[in-house]
Structure formats: C-alpha cells, structure tokens
Amino acid sequence: MRVLLFLLLSLFMLPAFSADNLLRWHDAQHFTVQASMPLKAKRVWKLCALYPSLKDSYWLSLNYGMQEAARRYGVDLKVLEAGGYSQLATQQAQIDQCKQWGAEAILLGSSTTSFPDLQKQVANLPVIELVNAIDAPQVKSRVGVPWFQMGYQPGRYLVQWAHGKPLNVLLMPGPDNAGGSKEMVEGFRAAIAGSPVRIVDIALGDNDIEIQRNLLQEMLERHPEIDVVAGTAIAAEAAMGEGRNLKTPLTVVSFYLSHQVYRGLKRGRVIMAASDQMVWQGELAVEQAIRQLQGQSVSDNVSPPILVLTPKNADREHIRRSLSPGGFRPVYFYQHTSAAKK
C-alpha cells in the first residue's frame, strides 16, 4: 500500500528506500513512494528530446541517461539543444524538426516557463515534460523533482551547519523566469525562515560560466559582507574559483550536482550539494515515453529521491546515477540496430 509521506527533510537519504524506488510528487512538499516497474519496448519507437543547453553538465548527465536507456530498450533517440534559456522560438522550430524526422514522442526540456501553442504544434504526439515545468495541459507526464526542494535542501543544510551563527548569503539561482530559478529561491527562503541566515541579494543570469563569474564579481563588489554563495552548479564553479582571490574563502553550496561541484565536494571547497540524480531522470524520461506510446499506465509525474551530498558522503556509489562518466560526450543521435542490442 502506498503511503503519503509528508516532507521530513532527513527522508531523502533514508536507506529504507529501495534502490529503485521512485517518488510521485503531489505538490512541492508531499510525495508518495512508488516502486519501479519492469518495462520492455514492443518495437523501435522514435523519441525526440529537446534540452535548453548542453553547456551545463546537468543536461550532459541527463543526456547520458537517455542514451543508455535508448540502448537498453532498443529505441531511436534524437537530441536537439537550444543553446541557452529563453529560446522559445528555437525550441518551437526544433519540434518541427522532430516531426519531420518522424518522432513518435517529444521529451521536452523547456528553456522557458511556458510553451505557448504547444498543443497546436505537437497535435497528437505524446509530450513528456522533462525537468523544467511548463504547466501545459497536454503534458501527461513529467520527469523531475519540484525545484522548490532543490532550494529548500541547501537552505536547511546551511541553517544546521551555521549552528545559530549569522550568515550573509548571495543567491545565484540561474536565469530569470526559466530553469526553476523562482522556485529554488522560494524553497531557500522557506528553509531559512526564522534563522540568522540572511539573503543579501539575488543575482539572476544564464547558466554560462562567464556570465556567472561576472555576476559574482559584481555582487562581491556591491556586497563585501557576502560569505556564502548558494546557487546553480555553474555559479558554484564560479564561486570556487573566486574564493582563491579572497582573504576569507567563500562558503559554497550548490542547488544541484555537476562534475566540477563533485570535485569541489571531494576537496572540501563545496560544503553541500543537492542531487536529483540526472542520469536516472534521463532513463525515466525514455521509460515514460515508451509506456505512454504503448498505452501503459503512466504517472503524471515521477522522480528519483533527492540526495543531500557533503564531503563526507560524496562517493562513487552516491553519484553513479547522478553524473555521466568522465570523458562522455553528448549523444545527439542514437539509432537502434539489431547489433546494438547484443
């Protein structure tokens, strides 16, 4: 019997979860645990995936999970990236490319918070919402955690880590009106409410290392009292580098995991990172698409559990379903052949 679990924050690392248990979110704070079910593709389906960008290793790891699942289940996969956030016109054109290719389902990692005329454009093609929510009525299933939680977990960790000491935090949640930035800020605010942890400023900008580095330098000049940077993985990477130039190194917390953030955890440069297990999410997106195409039962949303990673527990076992292997390069097209399945 499924049990509705209220959000007890230690829950995300509970060993009582089976390795393959999934979460179905009822809202940003409540979820149900559900078992992962076996799956077999009945034929070679054609899936087309859209990402905002592969500049961020978050999407690179998700891409790895997708191509692994495509190989495992014997389906074709085409991948298109928009080159950044707020690229609605580009992604609309890419959906047309997917249709011309003969895609039977769209796996949509949107670069915007809404996707006007999606129903008109995709017609009867199933759409799996990937990571970033667009609240479109025609989307029947979403793969991804509430971004509220990806801000809440780091905020809660900081409050505990500070032991009552005041902290001055710069938030760098990524692009404005895209990628869950607003929800992560809301989650962080909720977590630190009533504590001496204070948000000094919020710096919004695209997930590009130069943009994030310039934002950080501007904010440090404007607010020299900043001692903590909490934000996207790329913001964390910028903060790790900037810390070398300061008398007192910045404390760095990341809202999600990347390869650089993982190295920062191992070296003690990052004190905490949340992980929504991107490789696993890529696999789930392919599985949800196959199920929907085969007329099987599909949950309206599904995600892996969120991991809270620190220098003490950041090891290969904890990240095996989060990060793509070292040296992995983006796969833009995978075509199933009989030889590929052997």
UniProtKB/Swiss-Prot annotation:
GO cellular component: periplasmic space
Keywords: Periplasm, Signal, Transport
UniProt subcellular location: Periplasm
Keyword Signal set for record: yes
Pfam families referenced in this protein's UniProt entry, alphabetically: Peripla_BP_1 (PF00532)
Transmembrane segments: none
UniProt key word Membrane: no
Chief place where the protein resides: periplasm
Signal peptide: 1-18
Coiled-coil intervals: none
Top-level taxon in the UniProt lineage: Bacteria
Alphabetized InterPro entries for the sequence: Peripla_BP/Lac1_sug-bd_dom, Peripla_BP_I, TMAO_TorT
Function: Upon binding a putative inducer it probably interacts with TorS and allows it to play a role in the induction of the torCAD operon for trimethylamine N-oxide reductase.
Family: Belongs to the bacterial solute-binding protein 2 family.
Name the record gives this protein: Periplasmic protein TorT
Source species: Escherichia coli O157:H7
This protein's encoding gene: torT
